[in-house]
Amino acid sequence: MKRRSFLTSAAAFGAAPLFANNTPVHMPKGKAEHCIFIWLGGGMAQIDTFDPKKLGNNTDKTKVAGSLYKAIDTTVPGVQVTEHLSQTAKVMEHVTVMRTVNHHVIDEHAFATNIVHTGRMISGNVVYPSIGSIIAHERGAVGGEVPPYILIGYPNVSRGPGFLGAKAGYVYLTDTNTGPAGFSRPDFVDEKRALTREQLLAPLMARAPKESAIADYKTAQEQALSLSGPQFMRHFNLKEELAALRNAYGGEFGQRCLLSRRLVQAGVRFIEVSHNLNFMNGTGWDIHNEGYKNQHLLIQELDTALAALIRDLKDKKLLDKTLIVVGTEFGRPPEFDGRGGRGHQGTTFSMVLAGGGLNHCGAYGVSDELSKKPVENPVPLVDFHATVHAAMGIDPSKELMDGTRPVPITDGGKPVAALFG
């Protein structure tokens, strides 16, 4: 994105999101205790997944805009998804696809990823916290033996705590077989030796001013020490699960989703699960050019894992307590590029909510005939953030402190009232 275009977009976003509603509303308070945020890095094509339209054609010389896959019915009358979401179609009574999410001005992966995670444009003055860090800050962990926020994916500033500091940060892992790195003591450091090291370090840390980066580091270190050892690491042992259940979740991405359920049971408040761990332009859900040829495999992986997660949480009576979010940085237009792929689109795209004690309806909002813009119930991104916070029992209008400066959790976001009883 050119600098002039970005500045123009930033000004537009700051002025008003698409179809924003400025009337005061009552802030509902949901009952969800946990949030699993599934991240589809690269830009999921809503028209090929959760918002199917008429069939298009991307192989002929004269291409026809539309969906690549056939639409199928779901358990919610009148709500359809594409054929590669056949398992999710069977549990849609627990799901609401927000089909009219928009941020309108974003057309670049890094900026869009940041805005979907923080609800705000990048600022030169403020590092805004991510949605995971805000929930971790406001709700904390359910139990003292786990952190409030775990990221299954590579660390990134867009997922970070921003001005909230290290205490609202995440513990991350990239391998479901080993769990987070650095939380098990080396064999040569027994409990006595570890205690001696802590005692030697304590006087140095005590001298640090309370309001300093060192104090933040101290807080993070204390948490790390409290998590070290087998008590915390046992939550990452997927071998404790029945083989049939592990198989139901599918491959590595599915195992990450299974791990997220175990972390919910352990008391972790917010878990982000990355589908493709190390997203690079042109990979994963970034389906430019020939990228579309593997898109059906990505959708099938998502379908298998998402449906299994919903069923598993329901079986364990955790679904009403656990809000599942499926997010992506933007959607895709109905038109095809020269080699059959799709470009970027922020004017309308789909995000998914499941469980969490919400009043689900299969789909909310209606896009136009080719899913290019909203025609009913538009959901500006700031309202989507407000809906997630409200579902987690957090007031999205509450002010957090950046030093002495109050910053509201959302910029005037209003929860979608239809989802709350």
Residue ranges and their predicted role:
Residues 1-421:
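Ligand-binding pockets and gating/stacking loops
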